[in-house]
Amino acid sequence: MEMKDFREMPYARPDLEEYGKQARKAARRLREANSYAEAREACFEQQRLENEIGTLYAIASVRNTIDTRDAFYEEEIRYLQEGLARMTPIEKEAMEALAGSPFRKDFEKEFGAQLLKETDTSLKTTDERLIPDRIREGELCQAYQKETALAVIPFRGVECNFYGLLKHMESTDRMERKEAFRAWAELYARISPKLDAQYDELVQLRTRMANTLGFPSYPEMAYLQRGHYDYTQADTAAFRKQIREIVTPAVAELRERQRVRLGLDRLCYYDEALLFAEGNANPEGTTEELVAKAQQMYQEMSAETGEFFNFMVKYHLFDLETRPGKRMGGYMTSFADYQAPFIFSNFNGTSADVDVLTHEAGHAFQGYLAMRSIPVSALTGSTAEINETHSMSMEHFAYP
């Protein structure tokens, strides 16, 4: 598909009924294939259909998170989440056709064992009995996202959202820091009844989903959904133990050094964000200037990173500044049909803005390369844990 500026990427509600018919037809072709060539062609037709829907979903999702107040994209996300959940039987049919294909070993030989391992695992957590709960799960996640995005509070004459308070939380004025943290807490206190109700329902819903599929609790199901084939709950428990025994004492030592640097008798929770008595090292310049400096850095880093970031800038594949109604946090996503990553963030005038241009860019660089070198879309991503090696590595590469 011809590349377009993100602001000009077209979105039209997809015909999910027609998508279902075509997906079922591709699954049947895969199941009835008489040769590996036929099976392979059917598999890639299925991928083409999924990428087409996935690209539209990603465009709608990004635009929804940019402004959660936009009624059009809010409704589109609701339509897509519900419609795709109802496609579960067709989704499972396609996976069963691949997993049970007589040409399974041919697929593994060409694309590696991971593709079929992921398919086999997904089959364990895909069931049409979960359709109502999957729909409700999507609704709850959207509601939580919107609730936090719309939260604002007056602070020193300015109406601030969560990200608007962050710079004040780093102030060299201790009272300002304390007031900012209390405003942050007050923001959460105001919306906590709704957030608590949403979270409670989500816990019960996910437990019910897991029990329906025969899992004793949600974590067992979630580990499979997240691609943790070898990394078990026992490994997580061992990691928590290491955090408590090794990392926590090291952090306590760093906090003590910070207390001394700040000249405080006691380091309080509202002091932790200020690293130096003279103030934190915050970025100078506008968003456009920061992006231009990042572009220069990536061009100097390597030919590959330069090409990648030039692509991001040329097609405006960012939405960086915090604003009213914008979802909290930061993320990288991708538009498969365009082989294009996208970076979402909430710039707020702190060093975190620079972190975004390295951390999220690390995710985006991995996606940019993977979409151009790996023919199977399902293999262009990884688990959340492995993905962080891409982002954190880029942070280290970018250090002076």
Q: Each PLM stretch: what is its role?
A:
Residues Q233-A234, R257, R261, M301-E304, ...:
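Inter-helical turn/loop segments and adjacent helix faces that build the functional surface
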Residues E245-I246, A370-M371, G381-P400:
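Post-HExxH zinc-binding segment in Zn-dependent metallohydrolases
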Residues Q258-F276, F311-E321, G381-I386:
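A glycine-rich phosphate-binding loop feature that marks nucleotide/adenosyl-phosphate handling sites
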Residues F342-N346, I374-A384:
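Short beta-alpha connecting loops at secondary-structure transitions
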